[in-house]
A protein has these predicted regions:
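Cleaved targeting-peptide boundary
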Residues: 29-33
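Bacterial N-terminal signal peptides
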Residues: 10-22
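Glycine-rich anion/phosphate-binding loops
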Residues: 103-111, 148
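Sec/Tat signal peptide C-region and signal peptidase I cleavage site
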Residues: 23-27
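A post-motif C-terminal structural segment
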Residues: 35-36, 45-50, 55-88, 97, ...
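Bacterial N-terminal signal peptides that target proteins for export
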Residues: 2-11
Length: 539
């Protein structure tokens, strides 16, 4: 009995002793878990092409497993948005005007969710199958009034300090480059694409510590945690269906997504990654159902890579959405009016499955003498043409664009598909999401970056972020400085600020200024819209 009492007393004393010490003495304080966001955008995709792609593949899509709601896509000025305004809305949490990139409706630069994540210590990256300077990736990484300003966009991206950039757009990194394209007659010609300011951004990319890769093999072989820039095409990366045979040196969207995640996930705090499947939109503008399916399925494979990581990681939010509809594609057309209730799936997908290339890929193989026209048509799945149909193709083949138009019209007819437009459409679109903090329900496109920033622990509407950029001339003049813009109409304008012996020089699109000859790095790039220099001023 005495022994039992002693054991009870000893146990109580040990318990009291343990609780008398701070827990940090007994256990190491755990590091806060990583928080990651993979924001995936399938450009220009309406609901019917998602349905058609599912039927074409014959199995459920990765996207189907994470459908949670819908998104409204209108812009500040139109019921039907363009990609610049849509991308900016999803990057900044603010509706804006057509062509504006990272700008509010008044034309002032606004911090993006990617920039906010970078400032908060997260690793950041973008992936796209378009040139990385194109509207959607640009909206997360730059600030211009016109989406066509690829030179300014590309320069800002280089100086933004992102950790991973993968896609096309090599042409806008070099002072002079040449791209081989076909003219309207289907003849090869050399088109010169170059930076108008003459700067060699490839050299800057190297100086900024990036591992630069130009081919698929280089991407797949490279591992590590260093910064990574992949420029795999002068302009856009080939459609996935074409890439496999015509451009095998270019990586798939899924491969780029996997590589980006591998690099970014080595961050202790976490990462933000934006992935765009850019070219559903391009095929939709052409009314090419084969190209549209190619890119929807390519995007879905990339979603699979993101979900695989997120399910293992358990601290990753995945959001997937399209920025707007395009083409008004429908399963069913005027030809099915009288008997729409007796249309088996095969009537829609079998004509499409005969295609081995998209219309762009097929026509790119047309010889100068057009002697292989039948082969070109067959590569697009158009065999067994009537004499009337083939004559129409021969007449159209004088211009590549006309031939493409005739080919997609015949394919749509054979596959019982309808198209209402070659432009964007204004419907609500599907919202897909997975993981902690994910958005659900029918929401505005501007809600997405707010949900993301909240999960990552910052607010895009905070006073610091809202007032991040100031009118440089106004700010410094109020403090007694003389201000002038050197080279206002040149391609390399500089804001010069002077007071006594103090002289500051702010070059456009760069993340630094010169103070009496010494370079001072900034947390963001300087933005010039042709009239006003916007800068960030510490404190």
């Amino acid at each position: 009995m005495n022994t039992l009492k002693r054991l009870i007393i000893l146990t109580i004393l040990l318990s009291l002793l343990a609780f008398s010490f701070p827990s940090t003495c007994l256990f190491a304080a755990p590091n806060p878990p990583q928080k990651n966001v993979i924001f995936m955008i399938m450009d220009g995709t309406n609901s019917d092409i998602v349905t058609l792609s599912r039927w074409y593949r014959g199995t459920d899509l990765q996207l189907d497993k994470i459908l949670v709601g819908g998104t409204r896509t209108y812009s500040a000025q139109s019921a039907i948005t363009d990609s610049a305004a849509a991308g900016s809305a999803m990057a900044t949490g603010m509706k804006t005007k057509a062509d504006y990139i990272g700008m509010n409706p008044d034309g002032r630069p606004v911090l993006t969710v990617l920039e906010g994540a970078k400032l908060d210590g997260y690793k950041t990256g973008i992936v796209a199958t378009s040139p990385v300077q194109h509207a959607t990736p640009a909206a997360f990484t730059s600030h211009v009034l016109n989406r066509e300003e690829f030179g300014d966009i590309g320069e800002q991206q280089v100086y933004q300090g992102l950790d991973v950039i993968l896609g096309g757009g090599a042409a806008w990194l070099k002072p002079k480059s040449k791209d081989h394209v076909k003219n309207d007659d289907g003849m090869l010609k050399t088109k010169e694409v170059s930076r108008e300011d003459g700067e060699n951004l490839v050299e800057i990319i190297g100086a900024e510590g990036y591992d630069l890769v130009l081919k698929r093999d280089g991407l797949l072989k490279r591992k590590g945690a260093s910064k990574l820039w992949g420029a795999f095409a002068e302009e856009d990366i080939a459609y996935e269906m074409d890439r496999k045979t015509l451009k095998p040196d270019e990586p798939s969207l899924a491969e780029m997504t996997r590589a980006a995640i591998q690099r970014l996930s080595q961050s202790e705090k976490g990462f933000f990654l934006m992935v765009e499947g850019s070219k559903v939109d391009w095929a939709a503008h052409k009314n090419d159902p084969v190209g549209m399916i190619s890119e929807v399925l390519s995007f879905d494979d990339a979603v699979g890579e993101a979900l695989k990581f997120a399910r293992e990681d358990r601290n990753t939010m995945v959001v997937a959405v399209t920025d707007h509809g395009n083409s008004g594609l429908t399963l069913g057309n005027q030809g099915t009016n009288g008997d729409y209730k007796n249309q088996p799936v095969e009537k829609f997908v079998e004509p499409l499955r005969k295609a081995e290339l998209t219309v762009k890929g097929a026509v790119s193989q047309l010889k100068e003498d057009h002697s292989n026209l039948k082969e070109v048509l067959s590569n697009y799945g158009l065999g067994n043409l009537s004499k009337k149909e083939f004559c129409a193709m021969e007449d159209a083949s004088k211009k590549a664009e006309d031939l493409e138009d005739e080919m997609v019209k015949l394919m749509a007819k054979r596959a019982n598909l309808g198209f209402t437009t070659h432009g964007h459409t204004g419907e609500d679109v599907f919202l897909y999401a997975y993981g902690p903090g994910k958005p659900v329900g029918l929401i505005e496109n501007t809600d997405i970056p707010r949900v993301i920033s909240k999960y990552l622990g910052f607010s895009l509407s905070s006073g610091e972020f809202v007032s991040w950029y100031v009118d440089g001339a106004e700010f410094y003049r109020e403090r007694g400085f003389d201000v002038k813009i050197e080279g206002r109409t040149s391609k390399n304008p500089v804001m010069v600020v002077k007071r006594g012996d103090e002289k500051l020089r702010f070059p456009e699109n760069k993340d630094f200024y010169w103070e009496n000859g010494e370079k001072v790095r900034l947390k963001s790039v300087n933005v010039y819209d042709g009239q006003t220099f916007y800068v960030h001023v510490e404190g």
